[in-house]
C-alpha cells in the first residue's frame, strides 16, 4: 500500500513534459493509448490557475505612432473623442495609454483600428 501511495505521489508531481514522455512510452512500448482525460487531470492545477488569472479588463497602450503619424492622430482623435491637439499630444507622448479598463473585444477592436492606421499598440 505504501508503494502505491509513493507511486501515486510521483505520478501527481510529474511536469507536463514528463507526462508527455510517459504517454509516449505507454503508447510505443506497451500499446496503451493514454486517455486525453488523464493528461488533462495531470495538467489540471496549472490549467486552473491560468484560467483564474485571465484578465477581464484591458488597457490599450500606444507604443509608437510609426511612419503614418497623421493617420494615427486621426484614429486616436476619433476613438477617444478628443480634440486634435489632445490626440496629437497623446501620440507625441508615446508610449501612452489610449484607453483603460476596456473589455477584451473592445480593446482588440481599438488595437486593430490603431494598427491599421500605422501605430504600434500593446494590450496590458
Swiss-Prot record:
This protein's encoding gene: rplL
Stored SUPFAM superfamilies: ClpS-like, Ribosomal protein L7/12, oligomerisation (N-terminal) domain
PANTHER family per UniProt: 39S RIBOSOMAL PROTEIN L12, LARGE RIBOSOMAL SUBUNIT PROTEIN BL12M
High-level lineage: Bacteria, Pseudomonadati, Bacteroidota, Bacteroidia, Bacteroidales
Role according to the record: Forms part of the ribosomal stalk which helps the ribosome interact with GTP-bound translation factors. Is thus essential for accurate translation.
Protein name, UniProt field: Large ribosomal subunit protein bL12
Organism name: Phocaeicola vulgatus (strain ATCC 8482 / DSM 1447 / JCM 5826 / CCUG 4940 / NBRC 14291 / NCTC 11154)
MF terms (GO), sorted A to Z: mRNA binding; structural constituent of ribosome
InterPro entries: Ribosomal_bL12 (IPR000206), Ribosomal_bL12_C (IPR013823), Ribosomal_bL12_C/ClpS-like (IPR014719), Ribosomal_bL12_oligo (IPR008932), Ribosomal_bL12_oligo_N_sf (IPR036235)
Classification via HAMAP family: Ribosomal_bL12
Keyword Cell wall biogenesis/degradation in annotation: no
Amino acid at each position: 500500500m505504501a508503494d502505491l501511495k509513493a507511486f501515486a505521489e510521483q505520478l501527481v508531481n510529474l511536469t507536463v513534459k514528463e507526462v508527455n514522455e510517459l504517454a509516449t512510452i505507454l503508447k510505443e512500448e506497451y500499446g496503451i493509448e493514454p486517455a486525453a482525460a488523464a493528461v488533462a487531470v495531470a495538467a489540471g492545477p496549472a490549467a486552473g490557475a491560468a484560467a483564474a488569472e485571465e484578465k477581464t479588463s484591458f488597457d490599450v497602450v500606444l507604443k509608437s505612432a510609426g511612419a503614418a503619424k497623421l493617420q494615427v492622430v486621426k484614429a486616436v482623435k476619433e476613438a477617444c473623442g478628443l480634440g486634435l491637439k489632445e490626440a496629437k499630444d497623446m501620440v507625441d507622448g508615446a508610449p501612452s495609454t489610449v484607453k483603460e479598463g476596456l473589455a477584451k473585444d473592445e480593446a482588440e477592436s481599438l488595437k486593430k483600428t490603431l494598427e491599421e492606421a500605422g501605430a504600434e499598440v500593446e494590450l496590458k
